[in-house]
Amino acid sequence: MLNIAFRNEVERRIGLDEGRRNRMYLDSLGIPTIGVGWNLQRDDTMHALAYCGVTDAVGVISGKVCLTDAQVDKLFAYSFAPIESDARTSLAPGVYDALSDARRFVVLSMRFQLGEAGWLAFSNTRGLINEAETAKLAGALDRAHALFMLVGDHLATSDWYTQSASRGVRNVTMMRTGVWVTA
């Protein structure tokens, strides 16, 4: 998939998974959230809202003021900017870029959903992804397949999976198979 097509698909899928709301709401963990999964408790919320052209940040945070669609788009772009570089550096050199588009999406989705520290806590999973893709690149396809299945098993037994409902099921399937699952 071309870079622009991949980026558009990533944005579409994350938007479906996270939802898109112009007014503050409480997410599944009770965290004040807005836009496409923006945690309003983040340290950089005031800066991000100002960057998006918000003039009443306190009103937005309290739920009294809504963001415009353009502000939601800009906030998502701001929040997504570091995600791909974080995902790339969280894996062994060359592994992220060698993954299938579906597997790269799973890594991006988890990094977006969990934050950097949350994604980095999946050290065994990341190690298995490194090992699986390295085996695939070396032509050891049976070993790579078995390792990607194991990655899926690790994810499916995590708290992330339990809390992620249909997103977790789709992402585990994509990690195991390397192909897109309908969203």
Which residues make up each language-model segment?
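Long, amphipathic alpha-helical surface segments
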Residues: 1-2, 8-12, 38, 116-183
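Alpha-helical segment that forms one wall of the substrate-binding/catalytic cleft
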Residues: 50-93, 101-105, 109, 114-121, ...
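Substrate-binding/active-site groove segments that recognize
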Residues: 28-57, 80, 84
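Short, functionally critical alpha-helical segments immediately adjacent to catalytic or ligand/cofactor-binding
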Residues: 9-19, 106-110
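Surface-exposed patches in mature extracellular/periplasmic domains of secreted proteins
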Residues: 21-26, 88-100, 124, 148-154
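Non-catalytic, well-ordered alpha-helical scaffold segments
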Residues: 32, 101-108, 149, 169
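Residues that flank catalytic or metal-binding motifs in active/ligand-binding sites
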Residues: 10, 28-30, 103
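Short, mixed-charge amphipathic alpha-helical segments
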Residues: 2-7, 91-102, 139
